[in-house]
Amino acid sequence: TLNGAFNEMANFNGMAALETPEFMLSKMDEFGSPESYNHYAVGWAWAMDTPYQWTKQVASHWGGTRNGTIVHWPTGIQEQGGLRTQFCHVIDVAPTILEAAGLPEPIQVNGVTQSPMEGASMLYSFNQADEPERHEVQYFEMFGNRGIYYKGWSAVTKHRTPWQMVGQKMVAFGDDIWELYDGSKDWSQAHDLSKEMPDLLHKLQRQFLIEATQYNALPLDDRQVERLLPQTAGRPTLIQGDSQQFFPGMGRLSESSVVSIKNKSFSVTAEVEMGSQPANGVIIAQGGKFGGWSVYAKDGKLKFTYNVLGIHEFPT
């Protein structure tokens, strides 16, 4: 968000305007505490990604994906405090742990046949700093921001700006402008070589399509909040109808596992066994301190509270 947020859910619910500068100042001492669900302002987020371009969600550029990693294994790594430059990806972590433990890749987990792991173990680099890297190709994609790493080179395109969640004019994927960087000389992606080396750029663009096809990243989808709803995202709607029954002992249910009551009136009916003492406790709740509602008993009286994003509560 441009100005940051005390409660990120306000932005997701189209109510960022409720967090006025005066409100933010009044909460200053609570930022970073359990009372906040805060979100960095764009300027600070970008500054913390220096010297890379862009921020999270912009998976095309290193500012949206690249992070330092510390591996601690006193009995397995001979050198102390060494650095490694081989390209690695988060999908390499599990293969690395399995190889280090001398375990095979699991074929089944809890009776479910597993897809083959797509990463490459990093173990070879732990005691061989100059060993050629083994993870040579990797695609990236998020909300249409996409790119590919290929043997030190990266071809990337920023499709949408993450903090413009409403009203952003989207260009066609085919009209996105691609950039080309030589990671062996320009690790911060500062010097675009796309105009000097168009043939290599086209080769890497084609390689992106090959990788994205192989690993089910197509078709590209640049929607954001629309993905939260199964109906608009294209996922199966697990709950049909306009009512749902719950029973004692049921644990936490995800939002897509319960009937949607967004932007509509609703009623709750509960059968409760009362003891001899005044009842206290939650009967049913959805959400929490950062937004939601709850039906509960307090001192033997039935209560209902609607919490607007932690900014205001409407109790009855």
Per-range role (PLM):
Residues 1-8, 62, 125-126, 137, ...:
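Active-site regions of oxyanion-processing enzymes, predominantly non-cytosolic
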Residues 1-73, 79, 161, 165-168, ...:
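Histidine-centered active-site microenvironments of extracellular/periplasmic hydrolases
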Residues 93, 145, 155, 161, ...:
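Long, internal low-complexity/basic segments
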Residues 306-316:
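Short, aromatic/His-centered strand-loop micro-motif at the edge of beta-sheets
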Residues 5, 9-12, 96-104, 125, ...:
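Structured segments of extracytoplasmic/periplasmic soluble domains
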Residues 34-62, 77-86, 91-183:
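C-terminal cap/loop subdomain of S1 sulfatases and analogous C-terminal strand-loop tails that border
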Residues 282-303:
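Glycan-recognition/cleft segments
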Residues 2-12, 80-81, 99, 109, ...:
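Short, solvent-exposed loop/turn and secondary-structure capping segments
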